[in-house]
Amino acid sequence: MKKNILYSILVSCTAVLALVSCSKEYLDTQPEYAASPDVIFSDADAARLAVNGLSKMMTTQYLSTQGMNGEGTIKSWYGNFTGNDMQKCNQTGWAALWNSTYQERDTSPYDYYPWFYYYKLVGNANQVICGIETDGEDVASELKFIKAQALCFRAYSFFMLSQLYSHRWVDSNNGADPGIVLRIDLSDGAQGLSTLAETYKQVYDDLDLAISLFKASGISRGKGEFYAPDLEVAYAIYARAALTREDWATAAQYAALARADHPLMSESQYLDSGFNEPNDEWIWGVYEASDQTIYYYSFYAYQGSNASSSNCRSYPTAISKELYDQIPETDSRRRLWLEPTEEEYAESKLNKTTGRSTGLLQTRAFKEFGDKLYSTSLVFMYMQFKHMCSFYPGGGSFNIFRSAEMYLTEAEADCHLNKEAEAQKLLNELNKNHDSAYNCTKTGDDLLTEVKLYRRIDLWGEGFDWFDYKRWKQPIVRKSIADGGSFHSTFAITLKPTDANNWTWVIPNKEKDYNDLIK
């Protein structure tokens, strides 16, 4: 895939045919675009190209808007910058978005983007799913594997859409509230919203079938193909979806399965390269090659500490002081952020509104973290060095799922299942590479709080922040520097669970204009 990925937009049969129109089998036997989808998807090589196209769609620029880059935008704009624990330092011009004031603006591109992106994935996946018939006895193993991959893309997309455009499960009347549009065939006419319960049922059904097909195929993805869904990816999607649905036993079951063959990264990997260089902990990820870069649209062009993009050099990302202060002194993960000393904080060259330093803290930052900064980067207190680009201006790969999330998912589920010893063991296993002094003995509500804390610490900056706070039904509370926190006063807000349309993005006007079954 790395040099030959084909980006496909398979929203129509014609586009599917265009994807494979250069394949010699069709050039030799039929005119361009003459082959039927049944013929195309009976050929494993052609079907594989279509699934590779789905992977490429996760790192592609969209809507002619800088920064809308596929999956990375969802992580940064919708998961991180709008959350409780990350600040886009001094980027006050974007405060309306980062402070969650766009949820009810149905004509905004920020409301429309996730809908557009995930339904583009769904439409493409449906071409593969509907084009490959797997009920017969003579179906090639690879076709089963490819169909299972497409089912993973669809299940993941439906799940992500439900997190954004539907109420949190606890407020959904046990799933009776509106879900999303469940397009599972090639029709494109008007279609109403499902319920949220129906949405989760479809996600589960897709994953059940994917798991069955993966197992029946007897195939594993190739070494290094972290961008391609496989059996463990299906397990991981299942675990995350079940956790969000508060289906605790299912979440614990699939989290354990998903992480079984993906050991946690070492301490050195975690501190230096574990988030932009694929490693064994990654279960699924997004691949961006230097010869296929999307330049200033890329994920790391928005939150890479060493990126050359002005968005990172001038407005780096930083952890909240409140979260940083809860990380034990013995925990090596503290080294991923720039904590000011008392002297560095007290000097006049540290701006007490923005948190920017032009003095002692700046000097130390370039001395200690010079290889993780661009030469002209501005320095702010608590700025991060966890996420770095692999090539300029801000390119590189990143994970969607990794084992640490599965440990934390299983631990959170175990808390709700009254399996306290199991949850304690999972936390100890997760943290031993970072803090040799760590030993969890907490119980009850304190144990659940501990799991949530380490989820915030270990998965910081990976796109979970806003989504976790939504499902937990906890308020976002950001404190300004003047009030003992680290946020610019423009971002220092409290967002209650009932604010911002209950943290639910409205159905975009573009969909309602086209689909008269949605009002």
Whereabouts are the PLM-identified features?
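Membrane-proximal, proline-rich intrinsically disordered regions
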Residues: 22-76, 255, 314, 323-329, ...
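Bacterial Sec-dependent N-terminal signal peptides
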Residues: 1-31
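Hydrophobic-face positions in mid-chain alpha helices that act as interaction patches
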Residues: 252-399, 403, 458, 473, ...
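Conserved, well-structured interaction surfaces
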Residues: 90-164, 194, 212-214, 392-398, ...
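Short, surface-exposed recognition loops and adjoining beta-strand edges that mediate ligand/DNA contacts
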Residues: 37-38, 65-85, 167-176, 216-299, ...
